[in-house]
Amino acid sequence: MVKKMVIAVRKDLDMGKGKIAAQVAHAAVTCAIRSMKINRDVFNEWYDEGQRKIVVKVNDLDEIMEIKRMADSMGIVNEIVQDRGYTQVEPGTITCIGLGPDEEEKLDKITGKYKLL
């Protein structure tokens, strides 16, 4: 089964492109490290398949938290990213969530309705 990672980014924060790129990178790295530690086989499959990553946009914090609830209930690795607040957003602002890597079909049940960033 195809594995992928999905990162959902809040569009209500009006972050610049560079800021979004950094936040997505934080999510991808932390999810990958966590996956390596708790499910090495899934991580290795994802890595060997080319480390597929999809970035989608969500409206606000409520949608991020709903994604987290669903991922937790399905046992999917997920990581919330909170910004340090040095540049564009306040300290502690949740900017995005990373999911996976995991089976594409499982992640699509959670994030399939969101548009690509």
Curated annotation (Swiss-Prot):
Family indicated by similarity: Belongs to the PTH2 family.
Cellular localisation: Cytoplasm
Record bears the keyword Transcription regulation: no
Job description of the protein: The natural substrate for this enzyme may be peptidyl-tRNAs which drop off the ribosome during protein synthesis.
GO cellular component: cytosol
Listed name of the protein: Peptidyl-tRNA hydrolase
Lineage: Archaea, Methanobacteriati, Thermoplasmatota, Thermoplasmata, Thermoplasmatales
GO MF, any single term: peptidyl-tRNA hydrolase activity
The entry's keywords: Cytoplasm, Hydrolase
E.C. number(s) listed in UniProt: 3.1.1.29
GO biological process: translation
PANTHER family (alphabetical): PEPTIDYL-TRNA HYDROLASE 2, PEPTIDYL-TRNA HYDROLASE 2, MITOCHONDRIAL
Gene name linked to the record: pth
Pfam families listed in its UniProt record: PTH2
Catalyzed reaction equations: an N-acyl-L-alpha-aminoacyl-tRNA + H2O = an N-acyl-L-amino acid + a tRNA + H(+)
SUPFAM superfamilies assigned to the protein according to its UniProt record, in alphabetical order: Peptidyl-tRNA hydrolase II (SSF102462)
